């Protein structure tokens, strides 16, 4: 059979399947800090991304763009740390926030999470720890040891307390990879350098120690071999024994001589060490003993990153193919593996005990039996306690300890020793707990049981609770609770009175007891607790028992009050289904406690009871209010509602809100009918509250119908203030009048806005009230004053007129006066009335009323008296003015001197009477529009002009100067001729001029200004007016401009000139500039506007000013007159425009003139630009001597820039001088190339030492076929990988292959030779010199880019080299495919066999088989033996069977049959049958049982050879087909086999049938032999009968003698046992019999052993604790 493997190997994920690029599987781009996340950095379409793979959801990776050069995920949470050069950042991915950031002073070369919140940072010189918490910066822990200089840091570890730190690095030596480690103690602050490759810290607890030990495990591969060391670091804790150091060899296979450890992880779960090597081997070690448990190769590719696999206690890692692999201990197989394969039972026992692993059961059982048999009970007890999976902690073990006596010299029975050891180890199981507690309780030591329970040493069970219950009910309850026996727990709660806990417990454990039964029993014993228990039963949303049954129980005990409380709590949710219970609750209380029922109904707790029934019960109980709440029939309501003295008034008012409108009115009628006086007040309250619903009209009709004006008044008084209904207000006024509430009539007439005033006025007239004040109020409010005056005057109520104007509303006096005048009242009465009312009315209105009736003079005395009193009211003075105007009493003087009248009113009054007076009034009041209108209408333009000039109002001017004014011309004439000539105020002039300008009247404005300026006046020299005159002329009449310019002197010349230019008056502008000697501006006009350079030149010569020459030069330069411009600049001695001059001269190539200008400019300004351009001009004019002389002297020129320009323009000689001057050898080299001076170019390139320069010189040399110089240049280019491709392409494109190869060959020896050079040379060999490629690859395969060379070799069909590269690149699959595709060139037997074992794709095994069958059939078996460890043998055998090549591979089948594979066994068995090798077939069947036994047997039983049929019988026997087996033996007369198979079958019928078959053939000797063979199966009576029938008793006699002997012996033993039992019974009669064998029914009567008189105090079955089957399982005395 196949050996068990101690490990489980699993592939969790293939990273390429989730979209990760294979180029990203490397130590620098992939990190895995734990088994939860994998973090990969890769480039996708030139975009750097980080891919985060959550191993719990591996198929959905998260991608984020980043610019960092390293990323590591936190071991537990979605927190990522990013590093970009010296900048470190920590981000929370879920919160999308940055947690921390820091910039280091050094580059971080390695970093790692060492805990959930701490990062370790390793630089070139130091190690730091950076906490994720708070704002702390990285803390330096220690400096790197010198032994780690130049090493690649691959790991950093620390122990759990972070007191021991370890830094691990590796470095390449000539023949191996060396490892260096630095171990640092934080406490002691010291370091130790150690040689090692992989290490880890671990915590291990030695059996004898109290505290765990900190171990340091590390592995190293030196030149002599590998070692694993396990040592304790630091001093052992107090009381601990030190850990013995361990050092064992690490085996490395011969084919992995360069292998070395790369990773180590320690499993805390199994205390094992997982060691991973570079070649993919795993080594599994036991940490305590350093024993190697298992070693094998798990990956053909390097596993470059690992982490602990927490779920399985193993190790997880990623290899270079992107496989995520894990290895862990196989709990089921490791112990059998150690025991059977390693033959190390001690280690198997140790690991099984330490880690509670199965597989060593037989070892423990044998050891236990051995110690027990030897009487070493304590040691045997320890073995039983330590055995894994509790395999020995069984009832049988307890029984064995019970059966042994206490050894001599010992006071403790073995059983108690066993229990003591178990208690020390931990918790007892169910059987152990029972057997320990039984004698303890019998001895009355229940406190021990309590102690063990508190310490959780006992396993609680129902049986244990039953056992304890007789001694302590509370303790039993605790046991039942822990054992989860709900029925017993609830029974205990009930017996101890803890009813409140029953419901909570039942809900907690989801158990439903018979609550009704429990409640009934509680009620009998304790009604108060029963009520509480009942409430608990309905406390939840769903009641735990039927509420009706609970109520019945309450009523059985006449507990109405408690039942009420219960139902109130139970029915609090007011569900429709509880209607009957609600009715029952109210009914019982209405009959026994109406007040309680009233309170319940008052709280409105229930809504689903029988309302009609409850209403009748309420009325009978005298609860009329509740009855009304429940009645729905109007007859019932009217019967009850009239008894208002028995009802609460507020409630009754609210009750009417529940009735319909019709029912409410009917009830109100009934109440008023029954007792008007008594019920009126409540009816008014109801009507007031519900008047909106019952309608005011209906309620008014109701009260009027009963002629109850008091009720109507009170009702309306409560709503009138809020009602908008006119009828309500009118009815209220009527009711108030009829109830003599005159004050209320006054109030409502004064305040209400809702009544019909005409209707109320008529009602009050008809009412003939003694007090006319309400009528006065109505007429005053609604403007019926005229009617009021007529009514009062005609009814001789004049005193109320005086009252009205004096007390009610004096402001109505004008209307009253008008009314009195209309009724021809005496003037004296009216005057007196006016005098009585002192100024509380409008004078305007009074004047208006009197004026309308042409009686204005009536007011003259009163008006004059008011004036004399000092009245300044405009109305008074307006009236006097009107009177004076009408009477022509010096009105103009009054209008000019009086300051109180309203000008607009009086002016309007005078317009038709005297326009002059109207103008006076309007002018006094600044009534602009009115005055203009009067002047226009009456042709008073002179007055209007004077007014406008003096008014100075721009808006008013704009109005009169607008085109819409038909009188504008007449007005302007008066303004020019009269108004302006009269004024001396400049503001009047200014506003008038502005008004003309605003009105856009230029001609009129010129006329105006000429009048002011040219006619001698005080404003003739006014600068602004002169400016305005010229500007207006420019705008309106340009012919006058030149005349004004010459005549006027005091104007702003520059501004006027610029305005003239903007209006194309260039000569006028030139005349202004020339008149005022502004020559620069004057020539600018000639240049820019007149555009006449000749006049400008003449003007410049006449002026001869530098500024004028500069402006002229600039204009000439813009016109392209370079020579003239330069001459002008030289005359001006102005170098300021040197940039423009250089630009224009360069364009027209006027270099000689430019030299003259720049020489002048250089004297004035030593600018770099001027000198640079002068150098360039020298070069352009060919004056190289001047150029060389210039640059050799001091200068500020940018020679480099000019050199570049000369080079670009092909002036290489000048460029050569310039580059040489500034030592720019790079550009000088290129210049010399163009001058064909190649040697000089190479020398300059050497001085420049620039890659670009080397390239350009090299390419030029190649083009000139100067290959020696080109090679000299090329050697400086090829060392730069980025430039190599361009160089190669340049050579190849021109066909210089040999020269290129020679260049690369000579470059291989350079110190800076890199991979690209070796790679490109290999590619060139493949294309042009394939014979040299193999030698090149064998020398430099490690320095070439293998994928690139692979493609080249494949393109060149160099199959042998292709295989060689595949092998070195570890692409074994492709190597094998290439060998098989091109066997004549690529296949080599040894090489093929070596590579085929390393392939990842097992399918290649079967392609290899086909290949060998086609090409190398004789070597097939050798190859199959190589493939055997990983091949699917079933598939292989199936293939060979189909193709008919099974005989060819028989040696292979023999070699792998040890695997006990079914297909192999059947195939080999078939070959042996074909070869008739029955002995080989028998050996195969005995050695390997994994095949179809029945099919083979059926095949063989028809074989022509007896031996094969014999094997068929043997197979039938092996498969328990005894009958077929024996029949086949009988058929072939194989009697011995038949007898043996019959005996082995253990079947009586087969043996007896065989005996009968022998007797049928008279084979008596076989009969006798079968009796001996099948002795145990045969019945003596049957044998005796057969012998007697066939007369062969002699043949049966030996059998019968033996049977008789056995029976005699058995009888003797029975007699001996019986005698011994009787003796033991006699000895036990004197002992205290505790208990007899009980009945096994829980309903049994008093137990035997308990007196009947005391049995009633025990629960049923209290003394009947027995094991299943009725047999006592306790001590013998039980």
From Swiss-Prot:
Ranges for region WD40-like repeat 1: 24-67
Region WD40-like repeat 6, residue ranges: 258-301
Region of interest (WD40-like repeat 3), ranges: 108-149
Any Pfam family: Clathrin-link
The keyword Phosphoprotein appears for this protein: no
Disulfide feature: none
The keyword ATP-binding belongs to this UniProt entry's keyword annotation: no
PROSITE patterns in the record: CHCR
Assigned keywords, A-Z: Coated pit, Cytoplasmic vesicle, Membrane, Repeat
GO molecular function, one term: clathrin light chain binding
Record-level GO cellular component terms: cell cortex; clathrin coat of coated pit; clathrin coat of trans-Golgi network vesicle; clathrin complex; clathrin-coated endocytic vesicle; clathrin-coated pit; clathrin-coated vesicle; cytoplasmic vesicle
Residue segments, region Involved in binding clathrin light chain: 1334-1643
Bilayer topology term: Peripheral membrane protein
Region (WD40-like repeat 5): 196-257
Major subcellular site: membrane
Function (record text): Clathrin is the major protein of the polyhedral coat of coated pits and vesicles.
Assembly notes: Clathrin triskelions, composed of 3 heavy chains and 3 light chains, are the basic subunits of the clathrin coat. Interacts with sau.
Domain statement: The C-terminal third of the heavy chains forms the hub of the triskelion. This region contains the trimerization domain and the light-chain binding domain involved in the assembly of the clathrin lattice. The N-terminal seven-bladed beta-propeller is formed by WD40-like repeats, and projects inward from the polyhedral outer clathrin coat. It constitutes a major protein-protein interaction node.
Family: Belongs to the clathrin heavy chain family.
Protein name stated in the entry: Clathrin heavy chain
Gene it is expressed from: Chc
